[in-house]
Amino acid sequence: MNKDSMSPMCFLDVEHYVVSHNEFGENGFDNSKLDKASSESLLQGLKNNGLEGEDDRALEVILSMGKDKFMSYAKLYSIENALGELVFIPGTTLDRIIDDILFNNDLCGELSISLSFFRNNLEPKLGESISTWAEENDWSGIISEHSINYMNREKLAKASFEAIWMDYDMTFPREVARIIANEYGMDEYHFSQWLNIASYVSGLAQFRNKLVDHVFLDEMECPKNLVSRFPLWNNKVNMIGNLILALDYLNGVEESHFDLSLENKVWGLLDEYPISPARIGFISNNKTNQEAKRA
């Protein structure tokens, strides 16, 4: 398979590429940590199969995670083809995967990676802008209570939760999304991340039967062509996933993961919101293709 192939990337192709281009000695492949050379080989294997992205950022993540964790996370974007092979959902890019790993690193369990790019270039600027807006609009209590000096998803989501319970509206998360979109010119990397926060808190509000406006795309006048480039964010699976995170938050679980303990909630929601079986793997990739078809 080469870059010009019309077929989606198969995970086995990438694994074979890495093994064939590195010497691992008698003990075979070292799954615990990839060195730089083997990380570069894995990246090259991905790119040879059509997944392009920013090399330096991808290498940093792959080096920190190791092959198994990286490929496990990448499988969230996979479906099973007619031959029973795991392949990427059409339209998936390496940048898309890396962006989600950097932003949603809590989904990777013990993953420990450098977030220097995220913290140094994203959080201080957003923290200052959002704090300024909050003070000017009598929301400073939300900011100070949660000590949001450096923005991240968990703190911002909790502040948004608090805002919803206080005033029964979506002013705080909606304005946060607007500020972020405006400051970064609706660029792909930041908008895709922070749109997730908007739907994350929106899912919580909807679960609590609050009458809120959760259609952020129209309010921010997001270009339609930009929305179309984020198929995995702008669909029902993403909203269901965020709703499950909200359910866990209400149950006192502050750090949620898409794990097997959420299975019943997932399938119950899928019964209410039928979607393509191909998308189900995004939430519960342990299910077989045959089981997924029942949705």
Annotate each language-model stretch with its function.
Residues M1-Y200, V212-A295:
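Extended intrinsically disordered or low-complexity regions, especially N/C-terminal cytosolic tails and loops
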Residues R208:
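Acidic/aromatic/glycine-rich contiguous surface patches that form carbohydrate-binding/processing clefts
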Residues G203:
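C-terminal substrate/ligand-recognition segments
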